Amino acid sequence: MKRESGNRRIGLKFCLLGMIFSTGIALSASHYTDLRRSEPIHGDPAAGAAKAVVCFACHGAGGNSIAPNFPRLAGQRPDYLYHRLRSFKSASASDPYYSKSPMTALAAPLTDGAMRDLAAFFSSQPPTAAAATHAGPEVEKGSELFHAGDAARGIPPCQGCHGADANGSSTRTGQYRAYPSLRGQYAAYVVGRLTSFRDGRPHNTTNDMIMGGVAHSLDDASIQAIAAWLNSLAPAQAF
């Protein structure tokens, strides 16, 4: 019975992804960077270290942010970091979301090589543990949603793309390399990102498009619970 239930949840996930890719991308391909066949990102961590000093003001030394509204970058997957930087760099000045982000102006002058070096540097940095701010039933509910989803509400399990340990998929191919590790990330940042996906704010990659479909059925309580569970985990080691 347990395996049958698990198969239904996995089936829900792939059904959802199939619908997204068979409709949205076909209709809006020009608006999205297709990561499904993306090549691995390589850069020079030493060169990235020199470029990263300006990033420390918000993201902390080595990418270990001390402010919960700024994401922790240390130990993050390089492919994810690179494609996020590309999204900021390519954003339109008239975009109501990206035009308000300080990252848009900071990324604008970066060359492709610089973005690769920055991604390589931050991914190589050892993450420090952030103080968990949640515990109890909310964390347990977040773990349940992350691992099992909620078929009745059309929510697939997050682990299908982000891995059972929230450290990213072990597949490490194509789009899966660009899914971020979420372990130990600040709850406030995760809440902001999931809310943004749910509310249909700007998405720039096919992975973003998937997240828009996944987050569509999440209510505020579910978002808070998932963020609380992720925040309770020890961060992953550097890549």
What are the language-model segments listed below?
Residues 66-74, 88-126, 130-132, 174-181, ...:
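Axial heme c-ligation environment in periplasmic c-type cytochrome domains
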Residues 55-62, 118, 155-166, 226, ...:
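The canonical Cys-X-X-Cys-His
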Residues 28-52, 66-67, 124-154, 235-239:
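Electrostatic cytochrome c docking/interface patches
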Residues 32-91, 188:
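The feature marks the first
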